[in-house]
Amino acid sequence: MEINKNDNNNNINNNNINNNNNNNNNNNNNNNNNNNNNNNNNNNNNNNNNQNNNQKNNYRNYKPIKTGTLIQHQILQQTLSNFQTKNKVFQLGSDKLILIFKENETIYFHGTIQARSIIGSVEVYGYTITPQSTTYYPIYSPFCSPTLSITSNNSNNKLYTLKEIIENQLIKIPELVKNKLKENEKQIEIDEPTLAISSIIVLKILDDHCENPKMFTKKKIEIIDSFKLLKGFYPLYQPDFNTQLLTIPNEWLNLINTQFLYNDHCNNNGLSILTCGERNVGKSTFNRILINKLLKKYTHIIFIETDTGQTEFTPSGIMSIDIINSPLLGPPFTHCKNNPLKSYFFGDTSPKNNPEYFLNLSFQLIDCCNLIKQQYPNIPIILNTNGWLKSLGLHLTQEIIKYFKPTSIVQLINNNNNNNNNNNNNNNNNNNNNNNNNNLNDNLNNFINRFDSTVTFSQDCINQLFEDCDDDNDDNKNLKTTIITKLYSINSINNFSQSIYKPIFNLGSSEIRNLMFKSYFKLESKGSLSHQSPYQVSWKELKVKILTNNVPPSQTMYALNASLVGICIDEDPEKNYKYISYKVGNNLPTIINQSPLISQCIGLGLIRSIDMVNGYYYIITPIDPSLLEISNTILKGSIEIPQTLTISVSSKGKILVPYLQLDVLSSYGTGSDVMNRPSFFDD
C-alpha cells in the first residue's frame, strides 16, 4: 500500500467533498445520547445541591466558589492527611524526598509523583509497594478523580527504630538514604525519642510527559513547605476546595483476599472473574483494585474489555484483550494503550444498535483468551461488562457468561431499597382513610419498580444458565462439562462513600471519553489534530464499511470525510469478502455492503480529508507506519471525534473549529468573507 507522510497541510484539498453532509446518519443517535446524558447530569446536580444545602451549617465560612460553569463548595473543616511532616521529610538530591511513616499514617494528594519503598511497605490504590522492588512507580491523582493516598501498610510492617535501621547490617537500604538518615538522626531523636518507624519511602518528581496536564494542576492551591521541591505534587491537609477521597470498602478487600488472592480452591482451569453491575456502581474502580491486588500473587493478568462506553486501556468503541503486568495507579487516561494484545473496532458506546456483532466480537476475545490459557493455564482472567442490565442488555450479559464460563462473578449493587420502602410507608400512612388510593399507589409502585429497579443475578439464576448449556450439549457428551461458577454480590462504592462531594472537575461520561481520545492521539505532545501532519494513504487496497445505519454507496465517501474510523487488518480478504463487496467505480475503494466479518483493529484514525482525484485518504493516526502500510479495511461507527480535539487558536486569540465554517463570496450584504457557525467555544 502506498503511504506517504504529508508535511504540508496546506496542500490538502479539503474542498473535494462537501463537509456539510458529513455523517448525517449518526447525528440523530448522538443527539439523543447527549440529551439523555444531559438530563442525567442535571438530575445528579440537583441531588448534590440538595445534599449540600442540608449540610450548609457544617461548612467552614460557607461560600460558593465559581469554577467555570460549575458551582463548587468548600469542604468540612477536617484534616485529611495525618502524616506528620516535622522531622519526617528530608531532601535527597535535587528531585527526591525521603518520607518516614509511623503506624496508620496517610497522605492524600493530587498531582503526579513517583514512589519507591525503602523500609516496610505502603499501599496506593490497593497496590502494595514493597522494598523488594527498586522500581519507582508513577502515581496519577488528577483533580477530576477521587483523591488518591499513600498509606503505611501496617498489617505487614514490622516497626523499627531509627538506630536499628542505620546500624543493623541486615537491613539493606541505599547508601545515600542511610547517610541522609545519619545526618538527621539527632534532630529526629530530640523531637521524638520513641519514634517507631513503619515504613520509609522516596518520592521523586514525575518527569515523563503526562497527557491532559490541566487535570493535574490548579491555579490556586496551598503547597506545604516540606513538599515544595516536588513540583506537581499537592498533599492535602485542610484544602479550601472541593475534593472526594478514594476509600476502598473493607467488603471489597475481604472478598478479594479471601476468595481470589489466598483461595486456591478454584476450578482446575484457573481463576476467571466476570464483573457486572449497572452504571455508576464502581466496576472500573473495583477492577483496578482487583488487578492491583492480584499482582501481589500473579506476575501477569489477562483483561478482557467488553464495555465499549467506558474502556480502561483504549478509546471508546474498541473491544480488546490485553495482558497486564504493572499496577494501575490512576484513571484510565493515564494508562491508555495504542497497541493492546488484540482489539476489535465496534464503533459505538452501546451494543443496542448492533447486538449480534457485539456478541461475535465478545466471543472472539474469549476465544483468544482460551488460546493463551492453553499455554499459561494459571494466568488469571478478568472480564469487564457494560452497565446495561435490562431487557436486551441483560440477555447479552447472560450470553457472555455462558460462553466465558467464569469461576466467579462479582456483582456490584446499589442498595437503595431502604429509601423506596420508607417512601412507600409514608404514602400508606397518609392514605389510611382511602383504600382505593392505597391500592392505586401500590399498583403504580409495583409497575414502576418492574422497570426501574436494579436487575440482579442470583446463584440459582447462574446455575440455571449452565444447566441450559448442558441441555444444549446433550447430543455431544464430549462438550458436556461440569461448570462451577460462584456469584458474589457486593455493595457498590456509592454505598460506602462518606463524602457528599464530587471532584473539583466533575466530568461526565462524554468528557471522560474525550480525555481518553486526547491521550490516545497525544495532543499535548504533538499538538491539536488540526496541526498534526496526516499520512497520505492510497485507497486501492482498502475496503470500507459503515457499521451504523444504511448509507448508500454513493454517499459513503461523504460519511467518511472528517470522521473517526477504525483501521483494521483483514487476514483473509479474498475469502471473506468475495461475495459481499463491490466497487462503485474503478477509482473508488471496495464498499462492504453486508455485516463485516471479524477483522483485527490496529488503531484509530481521523480522516482529515479525501483526494477524490488521485485516490488518497489523509489520515491522522498514532499507528506505526509499518502497521498502517499492511492495513486493508476501514470501519466507521457512530463515535465521532470530539470537537475539543480539533480546535486551534488564531493569532488574534480566536478559537477556530474546523469543519464548522461556511465559506461565502464577499459581496454586498454578506457582511464578511467567512461566517462561523455558533459553537460552545465562542465567548
From Swiss-Prot:
<keyword id="KW-0175">Coiled coil</keyword>
<dbReference type="GO" id="GO:0046404">
    <property type="term" value="F:ATP-dependent polydeoxyribonucleotide 5'-hydroxyl-kinase activity"/>
</dbReference>
<comment type="function">
    <text>Polynucleotide 5'-kinase involved in rRNA processing.</text>
</comment>
<feature type="compositionally biased region" description="Low complexity">
    <location>
        <begin position="1"/>
        <end position="58"/>
    </location>
</feature>
<dbReference type="GO" id="GO:0051731">
    <property type="term" value="F:polynucleotide 5'-hydroxyl-kinase activity"/>
</dbReference>
<feature type="coiled-coil region">
    <location>
        <begin position="420"/>
        <end position="454"/>
    </location>
</feature>
<keyword id="KW-0067">ATP-binding</keyword>
<dbReference type="GO" id="GO:0005524">
    <property type="term" value="F:ATP binding"/>
</dbReference>
<dbReference type="GO" id="GO:0000460">
    <property type="term" value="P:maturation of 5.8S rRNA"/>
</dbReference>
<dbReference type="InterPro" id="IPR045116">
    <property type="entry name" value="Clp1/Grc3"/>
</dbReference>
<keyword id="KW-0539">Nucleus</keyword>
<dbReference type="GO" id="GO:0006364">
    <property type="term" value="P:rRNA processing"/>
</dbReference>
<comment type="similarity">
    <text>Belongs to the Clp1 family. NOL9/GRC3 subfamily.</text>
</comment>
<dbReference type="InterPro" id="IPR027417">
    <property type="entry name" value="P-loop_NTPase"/>
</dbReference>
<protein>
    <recommendedName>
        <fullName>Polynucleotide 5'-hydroxyl-kinase nol9</fullName>
        <ecNumber>2.7.1.-</ecNumber>
    </recommendedName>
</protein>
<keyword id="KW-0808">Transferase</keyword>
<keyword id="KW-0547">Nucleotide-binding</keyword>
<dbReference type="Pfam" id="PF24419">
    <property type="entry name" value="Cupin_NOL9"/>
</dbReference>
<keyword id="KW-0418">Kinase</keyword>
<dbReference type="InterPro" id="IPR032319">
    <property type="entry name" value="CLP1_P"/>
</dbReference>
<keyword id="KW-0698">rRNA processing</keyword>
<dbReference type="GO" id="GO:0005634">
    <property type="term" value="C:nucleus"/>
</dbReference>
<dbReference type="GO" id="GO:0000448">
    <property type="term" value="P:cleavage in ITS2 between 5.8S rRNA and LSU-rRNA of tricistronic rRNA transcript (SSU-rRNA, 5.8S rRNA, LSU-rRNA)"/>
</dbReference>
<dbReference type="Pfam" id="PF25467">
    <property type="entry name" value="NOL9_C"/>
</dbReference>
<feature type="region of interest" description="Disordered">
    <location>
        <begin position="1"/>
        <end position="61"/>
    </location>
</feature>
<dbReference type="Pfam" id="PF16575">
    <property type="entry name" value="CLP1_P"/>
</dbReference>
<feature type="binding site">
    <location>
        <begin position="277"/>
        <end position="284"/>
    </location>
    <ligand>
        <name>ATP</name>
    </ligand>
</feature>
<dbReference type="GO" id="GO:0005730">
    <property type="term" value="C:nucleolus"/>
</dbReference>
<feature type="region of interest" description="Disordered">
    <location>
        <begin position="414"/>
        <end position="442"/>
    </location>
</feature>
